[in-house]
Amino acid sequence: ISTTLILLPFGALLEKIAIAILPDKAVPVKDADQWFEGLMASKHHLGISTIAINQIHDEIKGMLATAAENVSQSFKAVEEGASEGIQAIADREEEIDLSNMRLSQKISKILVLDQTPKDIDTLNRMYTILGNIERIGDHAMNLAEYAETIEAKGLQFSNYAKKEFAVMEETCREGMELLKAAAAGDTQSPLSEVAEIEQRIDDITR
């Protein structure tokens, strides 16, 4: 449904819909955001979309790097214990969530401008990539919390659980590699495979 809405040619309507579905939560304004707002306020729209899309590509790469760090640290907490706590992981998870909101808002604003079919496709892929990064980040956070609970109760993972975590770690890394390629602008990177990977992770964690 969301993809169909994005393809509608009614920019003003799309922006209202996007604002309605985005979380009603204050988002910190960064220097890059101020630059973006200035760019969008320009009356010279020629080339603005390309510049804005390139900026968002860079920010998505940063968001992906943060998620990759959380994946790595979460599995480290499982393997070595969470005796030092998981606050750093939680802080990065919040950063990922905020980045997702900020970038989603930026994309909705770009879509208000007249777009080429290529730009529309690029922006649609960006929405998909953002959602995938956030979901993998959620998996990492849940895993870290699980490891912390096990640590607090003085329990240990069974050999079977360790094998499952090893499979899950490899699956997460596979998904991150696909997202890395997609975030770099590889239009051939099959995002449908990322969805399948997320489903495999869900199956393991049930």
Q: For each of these PLM feature ranges, what is it?
A:
Residues 1-206:
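Cytosolic, long alpha-helical scaffolding segments
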